[in-house]
A protein has these predicted regions:
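A generic structural signal for short hydrophobic patches within well-formed alpha-helices
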Residues: 12, 42, 124-125
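Active-site neighborhoods of divalent-metal-dependent phosphate/nucleic-acid chemistry enzymes
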Residues: 72-126
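Short, well-structured N-terminal submotif of metal-dependent ribonuclease cores
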Residues: 1-39, 48-61
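Short, well-structured alpha-helical interface segments that form or flank functional binding sites
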Residues: 19, 40, 100-104
Length: 158
């Protein structure tokens, strides 16, 4: 399996809070999916975890998940920069106009050509990227929840 999955911030919270969600990604890892996230997702997740109750447990578990699932952490590159800028300049979908962090996470997934973007954010799932991106070789990954990924992708490859 050469497909790649990008994990958004809420996915880490779901996996820490509910074992059944972590099991989905464990199966994906075992099936050969490459699992990625970005330094921006980790920064957002770490900050939110640090500000919440039981911060040490959450942050420790987050780092354990990175190791357990062999998650590759993506860093900014020229494509991320261009995509972030273009999403701000060519906004066609007002659902995300006040969500630069979410657009940044999506830009990472697109810049690194992830096949799937996993999130629980319904606006991000429905978000439409600027049409011009296709002309420069970037496409929105198939964006879905963990459960939808399990039902529509993972269960069909097992």
């Amino acid at each position: 399996m050469n497909s790649s999955i990008f994990l958004d911030t809420p996915v880490f919270f779901h996996c820490i809070e509910h074992d059944r969600f972590g099991t989905i990604l464990e199966h994906a890892n075992n099936a050969g999916f490459k699992i990625h996230t970005s330094i921006s997702v980790l920064g957002e997740a770490s900050t939110q975890m640090h500000e919440g109750r039981d911060a040490v447990r959450y942050i420790t578990h987050l780092h354990q998940l990175l190791d357990d699932w062999n998650i590759t952490v993506l860093f900014p590159n020229e494509h991320v920069r261009v995509l972030c800028y273009q999403m701000g300049e060519e906004e066609i979908d007002t659902r995300m106009i006040r969500e630069p962090t979410d657009r940044t996470h999506l830009a990472y997934a697109m810049a690194y050509h992830s096949d799937y973007f996993l999130t629980s954010d319904k606006n991000l799932i429905k978000y439409r990227i600027p049409r011009s991106f296709g002309g420069i070789g970037f496409f929105k990954p198939t964006t879905m929840s963990l459960e939808t990924f399990r039902d529509n992708v993972l269960n069909k490859t097992s």
